[in-house]
């Protein structure tokens, strides 16, 4: 099939709509089930590139959770400890396959943003991963294949209408890509940058010690940024993005947004949150919403009389600002990547508050010296990649 007709484009008034191969060749993707839309395909193809490159860079199965053409989360398939399994709501599923662990991590980092995601998987979808996907609110999935059992499980989702795409893992796009804006055609070479350890050789700080685990996290941050709408900043820990700040016009706002998401990820692991007693039958999405409000500044909205009873068996104690700060002070060895240089040291100060130890960024600011000095103050390790990673 060389084209697929779509119901509409970005919005219902944008008709007609289709995806097609300009040279008339076969599309590298098959719709196995459902009727994916324009934005679904944008998420699927961007997400597939991301997980394909994560797998190539780390040798581990990878997954990403996309919303509106940026990742809400991305991860490789490292095992989950008991705490992560609980905050990702998968502690009832037993031991998971590496691919399922990757998606649990990708979905779990920012569950509020991942609601209604489009999923990309680097490997053939197995039954463990399908079972995890089935219970989440999601628009669709793309993978290089599906086991018979996994496909059967996914076909039970959305009353049989769940979008299931199969991508040809051997497909190689043309080296030039085009798009139109206002009837004008833009052409550029594809961003085929190979994110490897060599990009991280130029360490500009006094501390130059990067353990292997941090090296993997730095590569993950750069690959995630490569497929995130700019400006973007990405915090990573233990093989998964824990905070992604996408599409901001100011670098510091990217760093703050991503940092606040990383903070929320860590606060969800605190004893106060882990000990919340939810009412029986409360769904995962409602639990996520309650936690998000509880750990935020508007906590009174979920603790008010007549409200807390809808979510909790026992009224939670207030999670004070001081208690939250004390818990966040225990977050360490976090990596942060930036798709362009940090123009001021305020980005480093903000990153430090979220436990950042390792930084990967292009460098090239007239204030690089001040940024490096701030990193040295906190004994951070920073590598200048010399490569910008804008994505639009």
Label for each model-derived stretch:
Residues 53, 227, 264-268, 353, ...:
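Conserved helix-loop functional segments at active or binding sites
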Residues 57-65, 164-167, 230-237, 267-278, ...:
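Flexible, glycine/charged-enriched surface loops at secondary-structure junctions
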Residues 36, 40, 214, 247, ...:
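Alpha-helix N-cap/helix-initiation motif
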Residues 72-111, 242-342:
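Glycine- and Gly-Pro-enriched alpha-helical subdomains that act as flexible
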Residues 1-199, 214-232:
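Active-site loops and adjacent core secondary-structure elements that bind or stabilize anionic groups
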Residues 117, 121-122, 135-165, 170-172, ...:
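C-terminal binding/interaction regions
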């Amino acid at each position: 099939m060389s084209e697929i007709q779509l119901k509409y484009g970005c919005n219902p008034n944008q008709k007609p709509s289709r995806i097609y191969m300009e040279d008339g060749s076969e599309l590298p993707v098959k719709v196995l089930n459902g009727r994916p839309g324009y934005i679904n395909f944008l998420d699927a193809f961007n997400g597939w590139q991301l997980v394909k490159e994560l797998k190539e860079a780390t040798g581990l199965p990878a997954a990403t959770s996309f919303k509106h053409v940026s990742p809400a989360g991305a991860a490789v398939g490292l095992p989950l400890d008991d705490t992560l399994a609980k905050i990702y709501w998968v502690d009832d599923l037993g031991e998971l396959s590496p691919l399922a662990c990757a998606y649990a991590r990708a979905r779990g980092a920012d569950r509020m943003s991942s609601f209604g995601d489009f999923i990309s998987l680097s490997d053939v979808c197995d039954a463990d991963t399908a079972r995890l996907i089935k219970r989440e609110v999601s628009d669709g999935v793309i993978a290089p294949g599906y086991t018979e059992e996994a496909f059967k499980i996914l076909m039970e989702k959305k009353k049989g209408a769940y979008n299931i795409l199969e991508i040809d893992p051997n497909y190689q796009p043309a080296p030039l890509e085009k798009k139109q804006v206002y009837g004008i055609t833009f052409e550029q070479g594809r961003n085929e940058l190979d994110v490897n350890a060599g990009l991280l050789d130029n360490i500009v700080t006094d501390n130059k010690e990067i353990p292997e685990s941090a090296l993997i996290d730095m590569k993950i941050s750069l690959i995630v940024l490569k497929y995130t709408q700019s400006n973007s900043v990405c915090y990573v820990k233990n093989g998964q993005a824990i905070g992604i700040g996408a599409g901001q016009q100011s670098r510091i706002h990217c760093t703050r947004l991503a940092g606040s998401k990383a903070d929320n990820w860590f606060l969800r692991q605190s004893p106060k949150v882990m000990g919340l007693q939810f009412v029986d039958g409360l769904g995962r999405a409602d639990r996520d919403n309650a936690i998000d409000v509880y750990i935020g500044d508007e906590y009174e909205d979920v603790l008010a009389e007549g409200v807390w009873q809808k979510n909790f068996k026992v009224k939670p104690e207030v999670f004070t600002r001081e208690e939250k700060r004390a818990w966040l002070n225990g977050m360490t060895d976090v990596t942060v990547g930036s798709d362009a240089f940090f123009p001021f040291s305020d980005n480093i100060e903000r990153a430090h508050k979220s436990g950042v130890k390792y930084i990967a960024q292009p460098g090239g600011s007239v204030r690089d010296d001040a940024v490096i000095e701030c990193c040295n103050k906190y004994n951070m390790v920073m590598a200048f990649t010399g490569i910008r990673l804008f994505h639009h």
